Amino acid sequence: AMLLTHAQTALAGSEESRFKKPLKTITRDAGYPAAPAFSKSPYSDIITKYAKSYGVPVDLAHAVVRVESNFNPKARGSAGEVGLMQIKPATARAMGYRGKTKGLYDPETNIRYGMKYLSKAHELGGGETCGTILRYNAGHGAKRMNPISKRYCGKVIAMIGN
């Protein structure tokens, strides 16, 4: 058996308390910016305007744009998704867009139609975050969570906290 001196026991105790304290400050959004960081986006006014106009929670709207494009209006996805909200041209047309694909790179146009789609996803998801993300990411008709949408929802929850 190992015998510890009083000094070693005291040291072990102080080591333990030293490591316990920082853990209390770590939150599940570690590694993601807090919601106020969204206000630094050059598109936050447009995002907020359309989120409010379509009844989408503003923090959710900002989180979706961040996950989709990291606020890059020139982003292009591998399946033809375009712009800030990575909307497919066919999806934008289903939401009433009548222009050319390149018009969807315009931040306001992209957010207008992307937010309209997100609003419907939010409604279909019953206002629940992961239900909304599933339907935005996998299509309005999606019913079962998939690994990609689950990861996406995890990122959004880490950013907005619910």
Where are these regions (language model features)?
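Catalytic and substrate-binding regions of cell-wall glycan-acting enzymes that process beta-1,4-linked
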Residues: 132-162
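Solvent-exposed, polar/charged alpha-helical surfaces in well-ordered, non-transmembrane soluble domains
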Residues: 45-52, 62, 93, 112-119, ...
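C-terminal segment of classical bacterial N-terminal signal peptides
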Residues: 2-10
